[in-house]
């Protein structure tokens, strides 16, 4: 990770860390790096989620883009994967999404996509960072007709929805689907999409007011949708995050079906249809041990990456694999989109339900999970967790006690000032005890004093 760019763009508290001034400079420098070889008036798409700070940062970012001669097409509120799809579909030179995904409302972020709809490479981000840190801004400052322009392309949302519908062979007539839109970017998209697919819909978290994004709703709070599914007697529930690149499902009896299980279900179906490239799925080190055991039983190969959907996508592109993702609900169907897509993943999952005639609980039960516990600890300097001797010592002690029947993963978050402690063991009791033992040392050594 660089000085400005984390694993998912530039993030920070809006108006104090991620300021309008920084957004303006990101527009100038990022726009220049991504479009300098395009010729006159390259086109860049700009979109945002529902955060109150989104319009402020959008205005500043667009000013920066226009100042280097870029034609901006404003999409308004749309999901991150919607932007990624439209970038390539519209032949844009690049695109920018203003969102902090699942983070709290105070945060925001800016992430760029290239003309191919993929997130930027490390080299491209490093070049932008070097320009940001240059003492004097020497980039072009055109005037008159050399300046860029701004136009609206709100109809892009409908084009994206129409595309999603073409990725499946079934409609959802006869299915009652509960949707939790996290008061975020999918709030209008999801209900429109599933209505077009002839589903019976109940929705929650679909009334954004600028302040309630991810607030007790969405993929990071699936328990809210679980209760809603039971109350509405729905066949399945789908919980998205603030920018719509994640989904967590709920089965008809209120059980959580996470990204591992969604990937497992879809991988099995794709293989049966002869559509799983190289009989391989890409996942991260956070996937449950039960996920890998289930894949072995199906004789499906796996490739494991570091945490972060960008690393999953990199491995998929390198190996020409078409399915990958994360336990957190970032799932990439590379035949259809270039990034994690909650809406796409949701309709692929329900398409499997309809094609097989099975309830989601039946499909999910085919993968058995190890007890897992994840603790997030707010710290002063997350990057020193890997070289703290006391933390290393307690991890070694726990791993020795596990004797190969479990695992420990302690790592800095790529997007927040957190250390994540993840433990899997043979029993829930052992998992809880090991996780608390390690977390206690991390808190003692590194935690912020509230």
From Swiss-Prot:
<dbReference type="GO" id="GO:0009252">
    <property type="term" value="P:peptidoglycan biosynthetic process"/>
</dbReference>
<comment type="similarity">
    <text>Belongs to the phosphohexose mutase family.</text>
</comment>
<dbReference type="Pfam" id="PF02879">
    <property type="entry name" value="PGM_PMM_II"/>
</dbReference>
<dbReference type="InterPro" id="IPR005846">
    <property type="entry name" value="A-D-PHexomutase_a/b/a-III"/>
</dbReference>
<feature type="active site" description="Phosphoserine intermediate">
    <location>
        <position position="101"/>
    </location>
</feature>
<comment type="function">
    <text>Catalyzes the conversion of glucosamine-6-phosphate to glucosamine-1-phosphate.</text>
</comment>
<feature type="modified residue" description="Phosphoserine">
    <location>
        <position position="101"/>
    </location>
</feature>
<dbReference type="InterPro" id="IPR018247">
    <property type="entry name" value="EF_Hand_1_Ca_BS"/>
</dbReference>
<dbReference type="Pfam" id="PF02878">
    <property type="entry name" value="PGM_PMM_I"/>
</dbReference>
<dbReference type="GO" id="GO:0005975">
    <property type="term" value="P:carbohydrate metabolic process"/>
</dbReference>
<dbReference type="InterPro" id="IPR016055">
    <property type="entry name" value="A-D-PHexomutase_a/b/a-I/II/III"/>
</dbReference>
<dbReference type="GO" id="GO:0005829">
    <property type="term" value="C:cytosol"/>
</dbReference>
<keyword id="KW-0460">Magnesium</keyword>
<dbReference type="InterPro" id="IPR005843">
    <property type="entry name" value="A-D-PHexomutase_C"/>
</dbReference>
<feature type="binding site">
    <location>
        <position position="245"/>
    </location>
    <ligand>
        <name>Mg(2+)</name>
    </ligand>
</feature>
<dbReference type="Pfam" id="PF02880">
    <property type="entry name" value="PGM_PMM_III"/>
</dbReference>
<dbReference type="InterPro" id="IPR050060">
    <property type="entry name" value="Phosphoglucosamine_mutase"/>
</dbReference>
<dbReference type="InterPro" id="IPR006352">
    <property type="entry name" value="GlmM_bact"/>
</dbReference>
<keyword id="KW-0597">Phosphoprotein</keyword>
<dbReference type="GO" id="GO:0006048">
    <property type="term" value="P:UDP-N-acetylglucosamine biosynthetic process"/>
</dbReference>
<dbReference type="InterPro" id="IPR005841">
    <property type="entry name" value="Alpha-D-phosphohexomutase_SF"/>
</dbReference>
<dbReference type="GO" id="GO:0004615">
    <property type="term" value="F:phosphomannomutase activity"/>
</dbReference>
<keyword id="KW-0479">Metal-binding</keyword>
<feature type="binding site">
    <location>
        <position position="243"/>
    </location>
    <ligand>
        <name>Mg(2+)</name>
    </ligand>
</feature>
<feature type="binding site" description="via phosphate group">
    <location>
        <position position="101"/>
    </location>
    <ligand>
        <name>Mg(2+)</name>
    </ligand>
</feature>
<keyword id="KW-0413">Isomerase</keyword>
<dbReference type="InterPro" id="IPR005844">
    <property type="entry name" value="A-D-PHexomutase_a/b/a-I"/>
</dbReference>
<dbReference type="InterPro" id="IPR036900">
    <property type="entry name" value="A-D-PHexomutase_C_sf"/>
</dbReference>
<protein>
    <recommendedName>
        <fullName>Phosphoglucosamine mutase</fullName>
        <ecNumber>5.4.2.10</ecNumber>
    </recommendedName>
</protein>
<dbReference type="InterPro" id="IPR005845">
    <property type="entry name" value="A-D-PHexomutase_a/b/a-II"/>
</dbReference>
<dbReference type="InterPro" id="IPR016066">
    <property type="entry name" value="A-D-PHexomutase_CS"/>
</dbReference>
<dbReference type="Pfam" id="PF00408">
    <property type="entry name" value="PGM_PMM_IV"/>
</dbReference>
<feature type="binding site">
    <location>
        <position position="241"/>
    </location>
    <ligand>
        <name>Mg(2+)</name>
    </ligand>
</feature>
<dbReference type="GO" id="GO:0000287">
    <property type="term" value="F:magnesium ion binding"/>
</dbReference>
<dbReference type="GO" id="GO:0008966">
    <property type="term" value="F:phosphoglucosamine mutase activity"/>
</dbReference>
């Amino acid at each position: 990770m660089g000085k400005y760019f984390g694993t998912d763009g530039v993030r920070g508290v809006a108006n104090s860390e991620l300021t309008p001034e920084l957004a303006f400079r990101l527009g100038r420098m990022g726009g220049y790096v991504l479009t300098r070889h395009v010729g006159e008036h390259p086109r860049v798409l700009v979109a945002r989620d529902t955060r109150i700070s989104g319009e402020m940062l959008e205005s500043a970012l667009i000013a920066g883009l226009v100042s280097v001669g870029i034609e901006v097409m404003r999409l308004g509120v749309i999901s991150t994967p919607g932007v990624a799809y439209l970038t390539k579909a519209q032949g844009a030179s690049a695109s920018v999404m203003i969102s902090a995904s699942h983070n709290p409302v105070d945060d925001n972020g800016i992430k760029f996509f290239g003309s191919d709809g993929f997130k930027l490479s490390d080299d491209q981000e490093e070049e932008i960072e070097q320009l940001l840190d240059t003492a004097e801004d020497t980039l072009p400052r055109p005037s008159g007709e050399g300046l860029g322009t701004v136009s609206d392309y709100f109809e892009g949302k409908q084009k994206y929805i129409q595309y999603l519908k073409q990725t499946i062979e079934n409609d959802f007539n006869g299915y009652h689907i509960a949707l939790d839109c996290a008061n975020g970017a999918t709030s209008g998209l999801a209900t429109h999409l599933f209505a077009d697919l002839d589903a019976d819909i109940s929705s929650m978290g679909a009334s954004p007011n600028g302040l309630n994004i991810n607030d007790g709703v969405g993929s990071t709070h699936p328990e809210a949708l679980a209760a809603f599914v039971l109350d509405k007697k729905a066949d399945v529930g789908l919980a998205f995050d603030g920018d719509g690149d994640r989904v967590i499902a709920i089965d008809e009896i209120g059980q959580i079906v996470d990204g591992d299980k969604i990937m497992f279900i879809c991988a099995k179906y794709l293989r049966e249809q002869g559509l799983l490239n190289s009989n391989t799925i890409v996942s991260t080190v956070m996937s449950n041990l039960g996920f890998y055991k289930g894949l072995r039983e199906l004789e499906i190969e796996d490739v494991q990456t570091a945490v972060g959907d960008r690393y999953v996508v990199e491995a998929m592109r390198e190996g020409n694999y078409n399915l990958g993702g994360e336990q957190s609900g970032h799932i990439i169907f590379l035949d259809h989109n270039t990034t994690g897509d909650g809406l796409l993943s949701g309709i692929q999952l329900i398409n499997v339900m309809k094609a097989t005639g099975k309830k989601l609980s039946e499909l999910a039960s085919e993968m058995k999970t190890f007890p897992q516990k994840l603790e997030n600890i707010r710290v002063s300097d997350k990057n020193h967790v890997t070289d703290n001797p006391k933390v290393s010592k307690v991890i070694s002690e726990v791993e020795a006690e596990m004797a190969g029947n479990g695992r420990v993963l302690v790592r800095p978050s790529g997007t927040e000032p957190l250390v994540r402690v993840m433990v899997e063991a043979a029993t829930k009791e052992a998992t809880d005890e090991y996780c608390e033992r390690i977390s206690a040392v991390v808190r003692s050594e590194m935690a912020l004093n509230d």
